[in-house]
Design a protein with these regions (language model features):
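Short aromatic/hydrophobic "clamp" motif used to bind/position activated sugar donors
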Residues: 87
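Glycine-rich, basic loop-to-helix element that forms the pyrophosphate-binding segment
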Residues: 65-82, 92-94, 170
Length: 332
């Protein structure tokens, strides 16, 4: 008789920065799904606004960082000393639907191998309901695949108008080194993507402890954005699989923790895209990443932040190339 698959234990890590109420909502959604041997850790990235006190009043285990060193460093801090078998990440502006944790853990019931996946990425849906945006509407979300969308108000959503849209079914990388969410803004009822995917989305995912520790966790110098793309590259370079688990559903308030049109987002995203391409991609992809950035600088309205990101990436390129050469020589 076939033995039932044992459910691995999990440590869930949520990173907070000055968003205590959002973080509490996320924690409540996942806390009720925890089993024996599981843990939930909230890392506060030096919010300095009373967040830690509010989180502790909720009964949450809070680890305080002495300074805000970014998302990746926050996750690494929350995973320190981990004894649980699987690390689960949930953005503080996301909500895990019932069955989310069980589905992710079922996909990672065995240690990573050529057959068993090392990591699993969830089905992340955008919160609310959406309709096609009117021409020129400034606050629309844009997808080259499905067009421009705007969020309906709560009353229209309650009437069932509009569409539920996908935020991510995993991470992909294009020919210019751009990491992006698979199925971004695809209506959920039309999403039927395969389980095999290049990488994970750090907003709602899980990774086996063996893989996490072997890779040393997230890169901390990226601060925020592209940590998941970089980690996905490193998983692939080890020959480890990442799979998409449709049954693990989270709903995400897109960009409620950091605006995607802010100068900071554009600068950091530009820098990290180029540095991640330099760290992992073939030379033509790195050149494409640089060329794309130059074109965006000349044509786009965000010249200042793009130029700043390009300058920071250029300063970091020698370090990335040195690391890459050193890694290649040590593997021979």
């Amino acid at each position: 008789m076939t033995q039932p698959v044992r459910r691995p234990s999990a440590r869930v890590v949520i990173v907070n920065w000055r968003q205590a109420e959002l973080t509490i909502r996320a924690a409540r959604s996942i806390r009720e799904q925890l089993g024996d041997g599981d843990g939930l850790v909230v890392v506060d990235n030096a919010s300095g606004d009373g967040s830690t006190e509010r989180l502790r009043r909720e009964g949450l285990t809070v680890v305080e960082s002495s300074e805000n060193r970014g998302f990746g460093a926050g996750v690494n801090l929350g995973a320190l000393g981990m004894k649980e078998e699987v690390l689960v990440l949930l953005n503080n502006d996301a909500v895990a639907e019932p069955g989310f944790l069980e589905a992710l853990l079922a996909a990672l019931s065995n240690p990573p191998s050529a057959v068993a996946p090392a990591a699993a990425t969830a089905r992340i849906l955008l919160a609310g309901r959406w309709k096609p945006a009117a021409p020129g509407q400034p606050d629309a979300l844009v997808s080259p695949r499905t067009g421009r969308w705007t969020r309906l108000d709560d009353q229209a959503a309650a009437r069932g108008e509009g569409e539920v849209l996908v935020n991510s079914t995993g991470n992909l990388v294009d020919a210019s080194g751009n990491g992006y969410d698979r199925d971004w803004l695809v209506p959920a009822e039309r999403e039927h993507s395969p389980s095999e995917v290049f990488g994970l989305c750090g907003g709602a995912c899980a990774i086996r402890r063996e893989a996490w520790q072997a890779l040393g966790g997230f890169r901390e110098d990226l601060f925020m954005y592209y940590e998941d793309t970089d980690l996905s590259w490193r998983l692939r370079e080890r020959g480890w699989r990442v799979i998409y688990v449709r049954e693990a559903v989270a709903r995400h308030e897109h960009a409620s923790s950091s605006g995607t049109e802010s100068p900071m987002f554009i600068r950091v995203n530009t820098r990290n895209r180029i540095l991640t391409a330099a760290a992992h991609s073939p030379a033509p992809v790195v050149m494409q990443a640089l060329a794309r950035t130059l074109v965006r600088t000349l044509r786009g309205p965000q010249r200042g932040p793009v130029m700043s990101g390009l300058a920071q990436a250029s300063a970091g390129l020698p370090r990335e190339l040195y690391r890459r050469m050193r890694g290649s020589s040590s593997s021979q």
